[in-house]
């Protein structure tokens, strides 16, 4: 494929440069989260879910007293089960525009986009790549290479686009994961406190009657009891607690961010569009100010330097770089290149969907969403 600039150049929706390597959208459109190749974020998601489930239901809940044990099984089990269901639904749904689902043959490769014929991928609500009429909220996702109705963002954690068809399942996935993390932290803290105060409270299972050594604990109760030393239990508990806290911080940020978006009646895509416009306006204002000069990391006013090189870099970064609160789901190109998008409404450097088209092939430093 020729990726040189020129009006006669035919390219796929977006060609993006990541660490000096040109990355192109898939020629075969993705159907849902199970379309190959699976992103490694998705593999990590399932590995963490399985690992935390085993630790919760086979190691730590069996240590609880009988009165708390069954409550923990019901509450935590219900949350984990609900999370599994909504996660699967969010991944399995095809979020494409209704006309795309009705008329598109997913086994056929996508056509190349000819910039000499069309200024935009979507014009007058018609996609020149999907060859269908789409609704006003539809965007053409560069990661799935198809039009997504009510496009919000492309989530690598579920390996699927998030649009109007699966948004609430995605939101429920995040909310239930956060609730599950909170339940697990409560269980871990209870086990830790009881171990320090009265370890016998954690040894109420009948199988402990045959264990005389107080430094010996049983894991994977009640089906496959395995005897281990206290140090092993402590190491497992600390690793699970660390993983749980890290996950809770990220999921909590993401959940709060999407609650904020719903309160503002915005999508992630629209939020990034507006934010990038504000950042661009601030940057332009600084560049036009004759008393403020930013050059090679120095912030100067007139002839007098106001800070060191490091301070200048920090000040410059604060004006030029924006990081989305949901950075584990989405990322936005930070080089200020307006050639990263294609659409009919407003230009943007967000890499979540295709907005304003230009006459040159799109080359950006950041190419994909990170969920």
From Swiss-Prot:
Keywords: Acyltransferase, Lipoprotein, Membrane, Palmitate, Transferase, Transmembrane, Transmembrane helix. Disulfide bonds: none annotated. It is found in: Membrane. It is a multi-pass membrane protein. It holds the Pfam family DHHC. It is an enzyme of class 2 (transferase). The keyword Transferase applies. It comes from the Eukaryota. Its EC number is 2.3.1.225. Residues 347-359 have a biased composition (Polar residues). The active site is at residue 155. Residues 335-371 are annotated as: Disordered. Residues 125-175 form the DHHC domain. It catalyses: L-cysteinyl-[protein] + hexadecanoyl-CoA = S-hexadecanoyl-L-cysteinyl-[protein] + CoA. Its main location: membrane. GO terms for biological process: antiviral innate immune response; protein targeting to membrane. GO terms for cellular component: endoplasmic reticulum; Golgi apparatus; membrane. The chain crosses the membrane at residues 43-63, 70-90, 177-197, 216-236, 239-259. Residues 360-371 have a biased composition (Basic and acidic residues). GO terms for molecular function: protein-cysteine S-palmitoyltransferase activity. InterPro entries: Palmitoyltrfase_DHHC, PFA4/ZDH16/20/ERF2-like. Probable palmitoyltransferase that could catalyze the addition of palmitate onto various protein substrates and be involved in a variety of cellular processes. May play a role in cell proliferation. The DHHC domain is required for palmitoyltransferase activity. Belongs to the DHHC palmitoyltransferase family. This is Probable palmitoyltransferase ZDHHC11B. It comes from Homo sapiens. The gene is ZDHHC11B.
């Amino acid at each position: 494929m020729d990726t040189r600039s020129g009006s006669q150049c035919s390219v796929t929706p977006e060609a993006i440069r990541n660490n000096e390597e040109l990355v192109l959208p898939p020629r075969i459109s993705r159907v849902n989260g199970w379309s190959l190749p699976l992103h490694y974020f998705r593999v990590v998601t399932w590995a963490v879910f399985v690992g935390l489930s085993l630790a919760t239901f086979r190691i730590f809940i069996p240590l609880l007293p009988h009165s708390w044990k069954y409550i923990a099984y019901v509450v935590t089990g219900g949350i984990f089960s609900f999370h599994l269901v909504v996660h699967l639904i969010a991944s399995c749904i095809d979020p494409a525009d209704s006309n795309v689902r009705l008329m598109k043959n997913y086994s056929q490769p996508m056509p190349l986009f000819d910039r000499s014929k069309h200024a935009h991928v979507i014009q007058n609500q018609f996609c020149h790549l999907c060859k269908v009429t789409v609704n006003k909220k539809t965007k053409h996702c560069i990661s799935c290479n198809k039009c997504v109705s009510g496009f919000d963002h492309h989530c690598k954690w579920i390996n699927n686009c998030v649009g109007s068809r699966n948004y609430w399942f995605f939101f429920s996935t995040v909310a239930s994961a956060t609730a599950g993390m909170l339940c697990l932290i409560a269980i871990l803290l209870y086990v830790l406190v009881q171990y320090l105060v009265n370890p016998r409270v954690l040894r109420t299972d009948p199988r402990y009657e045959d264990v005389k050594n107080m430094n010996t604990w049983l894991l994977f109760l009640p089906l496959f009891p395995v005897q281990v030393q206290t140090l092993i239990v402590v190491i497992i508990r600390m690793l699970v607690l660390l993983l749980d806290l890290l996950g809770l911080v990220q999921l909590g940020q993401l959940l709060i961010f999407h609650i904020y978006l719903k309160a503002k009646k915005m999508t992630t895509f629209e939020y990034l569009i507006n934010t990038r416009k504000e950042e661009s306006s601030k940057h332009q204002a600084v560049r036009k100010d004759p008393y403020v000069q930013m050059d090679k990391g120095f912030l100067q006013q007139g002839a007098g330097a106001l800070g060191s090189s490091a301070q200048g870099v920090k000040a410059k970064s604060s004006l030029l770089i924006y990081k989305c609160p949901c950075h584990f789901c989405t990322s936005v190109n930070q080089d200020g290149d307006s050639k990263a998008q294609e659409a009919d409404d407003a230009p943007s450097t967000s890499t979540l969907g295709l907005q304003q088209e230009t006459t040159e092939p799109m080359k950006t430093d950041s190419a994909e969403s990170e969920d």
